[in-house]
Regions:
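Compact nucleic-acid interaction/catalytic patches
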Residues: 20-24, 28-65
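Short, charged beta-turn/beta-strand-edge "cap" motif at the junction between a beta-strand
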Residues: 14-18
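C-terminal terminal-subdomain/extension
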Residues: 1, 65-116
Length: 116
């Protein structure tokens, strides 16, 4: 199964600890396509939730339901995680538009302190 930056796949986040996102849920592939194309054994992702929070930028980015993403979902930008590729359990559900991916990258810069 190939992965591409900005694609959304189902990921098995179990087991989780404390405030970590758990269960099987959609996640955005964040990792560079350079690593994805090299079939790197792990992938950096950000989980989604259907527990929407309005006006929560830069911690959340809302994606509208489309393609195989069945519900509106928030990208939990404060929860990026490296996972083993075996945790990715589906083909692509949908993908982020160029605008959504650029917004996600800007929010990540804020959350991770890259612009400090």
């Amino acid at each position: 199964m190939g992965f591409k930056r900005g694609d959304v796949h189902l990921v098995n986040f179990n087991p989780s600890k404390g405030t970590e996102a758990g269960k099987i849920r959609p996640a955005v592939i964040l990792q560079s396509d350079c690593l994805n194309n090299a079939e790197h054994p792990s992938t950096i992702v950000i989980p989604l939730t259907t527990q929407l929070i309005a006006n929560a930028a830069p911690l959340r980015l809302t994606l509208k339901a489309r393609d195989k993403l069945q519900q509106d979902s928030d990208v939990m930008i404060d929860q990026p995680r490296a996972i083993d590729n075996q945790r990715i359990t589906s083909d692509k559900l949908t993908f982020l538009t160029e605008t959504e991916l650029a917004t996600l990258e800007n929010y990540l810069k804020i959350v991770l302190g890259f612009d400090d």
